[in-house]
């Protein structure tokens, strides 16, 4: 199996993709940790990567809410004693649920498996909560139900977070995530058009397929640890196809850091989205576009609480 299991001992396990580590995922980790303590055991979260749907339906690329390494760190921060990553491949897909659970030994002595009633794993998704209870009755561990978490009357899911982002509803996405939606990319060379217009932007390329918000202009926060930028440097973020100049259908993410003058090429930026200022639109002239960009910056500074040096923390308090 494409999973390395260290010597953990007695444990309660939960498993999934955990994309975004939204509030429902956090509840799952908390339930697992409580169940583990009650059984004098460790809590273990097993992360499947890539998302199973990418293997089950070749050619599918999941729009991810977090880079892979941040998923693992946030699962740990939520309270899991151990975080294991299982590479989901064709072999793992064909494992029956009882085979997968048995393969956790000898490193893990199962005391429980925590799952939501609608989740499943293993070949043909046979590993339902009911099936795990049957396996546990024979093998000597418990099936632990994690009740779905409802926000505004609806279950929280990564799909729901993506839908909020696709609608440009950053506030709802943030409520579901309990943190600002973000993406991470590397600064690449663009056509320098922003610099020519007086708004030098950092153009981002991604090593994964990020879940992008709706096309538009956003107020955001940027961190560039290697350049001592941030961790909450205010910025305007454009997600769009630049229709004033051309519309080739390729969505670009461009970041304009307020009160920043420096070279960020090849740097890795983490960009948090705070609020959508406006939708993307085509302007009749470059001059009209520049006027709007100035208005966008003025609006951003107003929300931040004035001029140069304004703290991004102010925006976080307001939103």
Describe each PLM feature range.
Residues 4-67:
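N-terminal catalytic cores of NTP/NDP-binding nucleotidyl/phosphoryl-transfer enzymes
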Residues 63-71, 93-100:
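Glycine-rich, highly charged phosphate/nucleotide-binding loops
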Residues 67-82:
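A glycine-rich helix N-cap at a beta->alpha junction
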Residues 91-200, 284-292, 297, 310-318:
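Classical nucleotidyltransferase
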Residues 191-319:
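Phosphate/ribose-recognition catalytic cores of enzymes acting on nucleotide-derived substrates
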């Amino acid at each position: 199996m494409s999973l390395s299991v260290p010597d953990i001992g007695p444990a309660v396990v939960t498993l999934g993709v955990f994309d975004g580590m939204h509030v429902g995922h956090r509840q799952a980790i908390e339930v697992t940790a409580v169940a583990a303590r009650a059984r004098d055991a460790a809590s273990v979260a097993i992360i499947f990567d890539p998302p199973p749907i990418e293997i089950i339906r070749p050619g599918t690329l999941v729009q991810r809410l977090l880079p892979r390494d941040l998923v693992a760190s946030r699962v740990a921060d939520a309270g899991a004693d151990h975080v294991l990553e299982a590479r989901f491949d064709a072999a793992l897909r064909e494992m029956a649920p009882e085979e997968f659970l048995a393969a956790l030994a000898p490193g893990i002595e199962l005391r429980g498996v925590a799952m939501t009633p609608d989740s499943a794993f293993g070949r043909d998704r046979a590993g339902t909560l009911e099936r795990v209870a049957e396996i546990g009755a024979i093998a000597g561990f418990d099936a632990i139900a994690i009740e779905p978490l409802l926000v505004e009357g609806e279950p929280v899911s990564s799909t729901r977070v993506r839908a909020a982002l696709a609608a440009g509803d950053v506030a709802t996405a943030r409520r579901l995530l309990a943190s600002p939606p973000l993406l991470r990319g590397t600064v690449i060379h663009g056509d320098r058009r922003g610099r020519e217009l007086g708004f030098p932007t950092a153009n981002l390329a991604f090593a994964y397929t990020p879940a992008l918000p709706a096309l538009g202009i956003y107020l955001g926060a940027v961190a560039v640890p290697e350049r001592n930028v941030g961790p909450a440097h205010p910025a305007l973020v454009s997600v769009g196809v630049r229709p004033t100049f051309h519309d080739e259908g390729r969505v670009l993410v461009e970041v304009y850091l307020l009160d920043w003058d420096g070279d960020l090429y090849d740097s890795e930026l983490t960009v948090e989205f705070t609020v959508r200022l406006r939708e993307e639109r085509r302007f009749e002239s470059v001059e009209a576009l520049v006027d709007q960009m100035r208005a966008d910056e003025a609006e951003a500074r107003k929300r931040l609480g004035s001029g140069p040096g304004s703290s991004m923390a102010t925006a976080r308090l307001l939103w």
